[in-house]
């Protein structure tokens, strides 16, 4: 009985790990890449969408939400840039 339970658990773990890999590949292929190195045009309004991974700052410039070097979320980047 323990052997059957162990086999079932192993099969479940294998299916979960392969499922995660497949969904990760799908996510990476859908939508634009997070980092677009072309210059981002400034936004015209504060609530305007700058595109995926960017936010519009008070000075109407588009800034990345994630710092490429440290991969940390920089939601305060607008305040840092304008200070």
Curated annotation (Swiss-Prot):
Propeptide: 20-42
Keyword Ribosomal protein: no
Cysteine pairings via disulfide bonds: 43-57, 50-62, 56-78
Tissue: Expressed by the venom duct.
Similarity comment text for this entry: Belongs to the conotoxin I3 superfamily.
Signal sequence bounds: 1-19
Name of the protein described by the UniProt record: Conotoxin Pu6.1
Organism: Conus pulicarius (Flea-bitten cone)
